[in-house]
Amino acid sequence: MRPLSKYTKPIPAGSLFGLITIYGMIPLTEQLYAFQIVIILNIATLRQSDTVYLLDSSIYIFQAWFGYPDYFHDASGRSVNAVYGYAKTLFSQLRTLNPVYLLAAFDESLFSGFRHELYPDYKANRALPDEELAHQLYLCRRLTELSGVHCVGDSVYEADDWLALGAKVAAAGGLKTAVITRDKDLAQLVRPGDLWWDWAAGKQRDYQALREHWTVLPEEIPDLLALMGDSSDNIPGIAGIGEKSSKALLQHFGNLENLYGDLDSVLGLEMRGVRRLYNALQDTEEEAFLFRELIRLHPPPQHLTLQDMSLEPVSSDRILDFFDQEGLGAAFRNLVTQHYA
């Protein structure tokens, strides 16, 4: 059979019937073969373009920061282990996903966000990045931008909030989302058809799997964590209410409004220690709702479109030039060469 390239010309991306206009140029015996090729190529495109990928970039930078040895340095001797590890992960994600839409969010609001105004002890158990790590965070964001990915983050809203905005835009456009993260807080974004994806662990959970894992609906996770607490964000929860009790309460009441609106009903639950739970919940309504407000995601009041989240054309030479300008050596150049081979 003769190669189809003899008969074809460039076809608009995503056009299922792009070859129809030139079918008259193709022998009848080859038309079916050509049409099958077009269908296969376009189904592959549709698999990618019906999903907006939301990348929690900061979590993978810190994962590389802690996970890679202090072996990689720039020309001035500064450590760049986090940049190397993050670059490997980013290139792997881009190669595997081949996304049409991808939004990368970065945390830039530690100790300056609106949540600290609501609750000064929020994330008080964390430290600001030192100068060396701050430089690596900058390099990682710049690399992501040069890789054609739309990047977001500011000093008021957390990365999670920006990803919530991306999910909102995706839903308005009738698209699914896949949240790439290890952060349990982001599971609250998942709706039927979406995914929560722990990339490093190779673990994907859809809406039902998250519901089974947490025993509450994904959108109820803020209510759950408000009761049981979240030590990673220095949110204490309600004293005397642990994870098991919190899940049992939410399975019955569904949310904080129903729980505190009918608190006397706790005494009638068929579970151990209901009197203790009832006493622990007394006069804690304001606390619980505050904690939920901290855990809930708040999309920034900014304009974002699907077009903004479209992956842009990439020049590997620009990335190589960036590595050269920042004094990053052969190991980094090899990553680019392998990725764009």
Tell what function each PLM region has.
Residues Y7, F17, Y23, Y33-F35:
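Aromatic (phenylalanine/tyrosine) cluster motif
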Residues I43-T177, L186-L195, W199-K203, F289-L290, ...:
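Noncatalytic, basic helical substrate-engagement surface that gates or grips nucleic-acid strands
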Residues R2-S5:
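Low-acidity, Ser/Thr- and Arg-rich intrinsically disordered low-complexity segments
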Residues M25, A34-T45:
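Short, positively charged and aromatic/hydrophobic N-terminal segments
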Residues I43-S49, V100-L103, V149, G193, ...:
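Non-catalytic nucleic-acid-binding/docking modules located in mid-to-C-terminal regions
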Residues Y7-P10, I43:
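N-terminal cationic leader/targeting segments used for protein routing and processing
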